[in-house]
Amino acid sequence: DKAKDKMWWSTPENVGHDKTATNTIVEDLSSSLKMVYGEPDARSTTNMRSRGDAKIKVKDKSSGVKITYSFKKAGITVPVTYTLEDDYLEAKIDTADIEEEDTSQSGKLVTSLSVLSSFGAASSADTGYFVIPDGSGALIRFNNGKKTAKSYTGYVYGSDVTAVAQTEPAVTEQVYLPMYGIVNGDNAMMVVCTEGDSNAKLTASVSGQSKSSFNICGFDFTVRDSDTYYMSGDNSTALTVFEDGDMKTDTLAVRYYPLETEDTPDYTDVAEAYRNYLTEEAGVTDTAEDTDPGLYLNFYGGTIKEKSV
């Protein structure tokens, strides 16, 4: 961000020196692309990370690069286009370009993808918060000490109502907006999922809770659903089945907007940036009309309540 002389990192700075993170977590945080694939025959899923699991090929493009991640073990190749525009960075995946060697019952198929999930991660020394569109909005403050609490998860526009829940969900409000914000000291960023948002899940965790010293927030995309069930009353062995057919969304895209503010930024600047995105780029128009009502009407109600004395 040249306007504020701020360096935003796609993966946490000095993550390899984090003494609280295991090698697996370090690889997780260091990966610009994470993937989960399913094996129908084995009824199981496997996590893959670009750091350690993929070979990378880079090709220059207009205003950006196209990086192809080849996961040889899974036989899956995922191209991601990173584009730098005047006021944002965009990461985009066209699912039609994803190559899967074998999606049959005996093969491997992509079930979820996460790109730049550690972008803008805050360290244990940083001061700030994530702006989460949970209901009317909520703040998750960095390093708040809630290490044993469950990490935040919110499905954009709600979870799949046809899926049978395996556990009691956390008490949260509905995520109505495909965005979140990062406010870190004198700098801020608004992040919006512009495509594939109906299949997006927003996750956030603070230091300790993330099994590292970093505070992290980002989107995960479900491209094929899966379900788990148990046979013959045996609760010790879970069987997983996967959605058939092609991936359910054509494009996945996330934009990162660094904010320019005259004063120290806060969550109102994040909200303003998202409003500007809606009106200037997403085609949302103001339908409210200024009118002078001829009548103001207030309703009052009451009830009789019996009480022991």
Predicted segment positions?
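Carbohydrate-recognition beta-sandwich/jelly-roll modules
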Residues: 1-309
